[in-house]
Amino acid sequence: MRVAVSPAGLAAAGVVARGSAAAQIRRAAAVAARSVRNDRVRHVAAPAPDTTARGDVAGPRAAFLSPFAPPDVADVDVDGSTAVKEKRTKKKLRLRIDGEWYDCTGWAKAHPGGSMFITLMDGCDATDVFYALHSYGPNGDDTAARRLAMLPKCGGPEEDLTEGEEAVFSGVGRSASPPGAPHTFDVSPGEADAAFADLRKKFEREGWFARDPLKEAAVLATTLGLYGLGWFLAGTHPILATLSLGLGMQQAGWLAHDYIHGRGPWCAAMRGFGALTNGFSAEWWQHKHNMHHSFTNIDGRDGDIKLEPLYFLQDPEVTGRPDNPAMRKWQHWYGYPLYAFTYALWRRHSVASAWARKDKTELALLAVHYTWLFTALPLGVALGSILVGGFLVGSLVTATHQTEEIMFEQNGQFVDIQFRSTREADVKGLEAWLWGGMDTQLVHHLFPTMPRYRHHDARPVIQKWAEERGYDFRISTSGEILGKNFNHLKELAHI
């Protein structure tokens, strides 16, 4: 039996969000889900009882929009830190990659992607996510593979279990799991995972991950051209300047996203582009965003779906987290306008993160950016362009995830989770340019280091691969996706 509760799942089962019967079903589902999690916690040795199960604390703040989110640890807390505390009581932090278990205990703090990822993946097969986030092969960088080869090998997670626990957990991820609970350690890649590895190798051999200098130059020139035009118009045509700079900031955000995901000397050299153009810390963003890629739509781990108290993407009775009915009932009306503050909040987190880390390089780049922003531009144009850019990014960046399946546990392998949590947008021309690669979100999530200008050509290849293996490749028009997001917020506003 697997417990995986989400508003979408309840809707699919024919449960309407109103009425006492629906409320009873939601409450029962919430109690069942929390009971499963608490039962699992009792099977893990800990120095003292943990009192921070889901529902006892406010939980993770919104990494995406909340002004209260901390700038460190990718802005993610995990179920009141219960899961993290469970992992830390173990003797080793171990991941399985390509069939081998590696002891990552000593490496966790030095991991460029942050220690939180290794802590949460402890005891799991990380093969697909490792290769997704670290390029390799003829068009990539083998740094991560070389570092991996230097790590000590070890046995599986059963080494750290007591005799009683071993009886409960010995089959997890293979053929059995604790009664009534989802798999905690999913460590057996199936046929689809092997086929996905073959697909990635095919793309590598055929050069899909290589950067095209002409296309790179065209995208960069277009983005900088919008900045130049806005700067030129700032003194005489402030509204046009604000729109031009806002568009430029949106496109610069997409471009910085490409550079940080990408590998090779060009992307490494352009890593600070987001700091210079938008005031974004590459280090802060990378940690936050890699958590999203690794744990897409997994409640308590993916900060991009944890937006309370500003937005409720799930029924509070299901999550067990505090409700705010006064705000929630209006969220479908203020939701989209509030996205305008996305960039302002990302900027705040970026400065706080760079300052806390005493990162002199990033602080210098941020200083150059803010000197230009507030000395070369009128104040109204500077602030207005941040709001325009923030709205254009915020309204699109998570639209393809928020109404898809939200999972309470990491049930399934990396590829399976991406198909369940992601929808693509069917757009062309100017509309595709505005989406900046977010329209091919599933392609991007499966192959994050692939340049976005190759996504549309890769889409039919992946669609065929998915159809042959029974995966649901979801794609809708942008109007349908944005409407679906509005209706989802409205449905949760009226529960």
Q: Model-found features: residue ranges?
A:
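Transmembrane alpha-helix/helix-exit interface in multi-pass inner-membrane proteins
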Residues: 393-410
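Alpha-helical bilayer-embedded segments of polytopic membrane proteins, i.e.
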Residues: 210-252, 275-280, 330-345, 356-397
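N-terminal chloroplast transit peptides
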Residues: 1-25, 29
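Long, hydrophobic alpha-helical transmembrane bundles and adjoining juxtamembrane helices/loops
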Residues: 179-191, 235-238, 248, 258
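Cytosolic juxtamembrane N-terminal segments of multi-pass membrane proteins
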Residues: 191-209, 341, 345-349
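Membrane-embedded catalytic scaffold of the fatty acid hydroxylase/desaturase
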Residues: 3, 244-357, 408-494
